[in-house]
Amino acid sequence: MTSPSDVEASTETVDRGSRRNQTNDNPSADLVRVYLNGIGKTALLNAEDEVELAQTIEVGLYAEYLLENSQEPLTRAMKRDLKVLVKEGRKARSHLLEANLRLVVSLAKRYTGRGMPLLDLIQEGNLGLIRAMEKFDYSKGFKFSTYATWWIRQAITRGMADQSRTIRLPVHLVEQVNKLSRIKREMYQQLGREATNEELAEESGIEESKIEMLLRQSRDPVSLDMPVGADEEAPLGDFIEDSEATDAESAVVASLRHSDIRTVLDTLEQREQDVIRLRYGLDDGVPRTLDQIGRQFGLSRERVRQIEREVMSKLRDGARAEKLRAYAQ
């Protein structure tokens, strides 16, 4: 009988094997078949079997505790008996795990087609099965397989949240997305059409205001490098507009405007040019206050204001105004 660590190691070996053989014809199906044949050799358990195994596991754990933490000296015979109980407990643990591996496969198959290979789903489910066995309390009267189902599903959905999505989502959100996707498929089969958000909200118990958000989260991301078009030579990113980019016409107009402004300013006295450049941030885009400009040139606030007014008056007259008028329209 294999130990629990052997169960974990075997699933990891199957998982690694699937990655090494991706170039073979349908290697995953072959590995799943081998795995199913292996786990199918252990008979299923009834409720009485589960309780008996759980009791044996509990006794084994207590015996292991006594061996490691006993406050009283243990005789050789006592140690021998305790070691036997530990060994029997570990066998029972392995038996309980192996008898429920088919349950993991059954649940894992329900999550295929969502971005994660079946063997990876099984691996995650097996971790949930081990966790269920560690938490199982036979004295409460639950059947182990019923109790383990919740832990297996939780482990699979969390594994999917961590591994299958390019953009990871919180676990609670993944569970809601999965629930809504399942309901959406079922309602499509019943209605023969896509269900409305209102219908999905009523069926799922999720607020209608959250439905659209969850549906968006359920969509798989698309790479901007994905080839599109008839010849599939151009990447998708080439067809998406950059709303923040400056178009060619705007760039030309901006260049001409700056050139004309420089030409107009060159007709002013140097101090007038400096004051206007600082006042309107023409060089660095940062406008200065009258006080800031006054401190820089040793002028009063009112004198700076006077220079600004004089310049504005000059710019409204003659050729200077004509050159700038086009940009004010």
Curated annotation (Swiss-Prot):
PROSITE patterns: SIGMA70_1, SIGMA70_2
Pfam families the record matches: Sigma70_r1_2, Sigma70_r2, Sigma70_r3, Sigma70_r4
A GO MF label: sigma factor activity
Encoding gene per record: sigB
Family per similarity comment: Belongs to the sigma-70 factor family.
Protein name, UniProt field: RNA polymerase sigma factor SigB
A single BP term in Gene Ontology: DNA-templated transcription initiation
Comp. bias (Polar residues): 1-12
InterPro entries, A to Z: RNA_pol_sigma-70_dom (IPR014284), RNA_pol_sigma70 (IPR000943), RNA_pol_sigma70_r1_2 (IPR009042), RNA_pol_sigma70_r2 (IPR007627), RNA_pol_sigma70_r3 (IPR007624), RNA_pol_sigma70_r4 (IPR007630), RNA_pol_sigma_r2 (IPR013325), RNA_pol_sigma_r3/r4-like (IPR013324)
Reported function: Sigma factors are initiation factors that promote the attachment of RNA polymerase to specific initiation sites and are then released.
DNA-binding residues: 290-309
Keywords: DNA-binding, Sigma factor, Transcription, Transcription regulation
Organism (species): Corynebacterium diphtheriae (strain ATCC 700971 / NCTC 13129 / Biotype gravis)
Ranges where the record places region Disordered: 1-27
Renumbered ranges of motif Polymerase core binding: 120-133
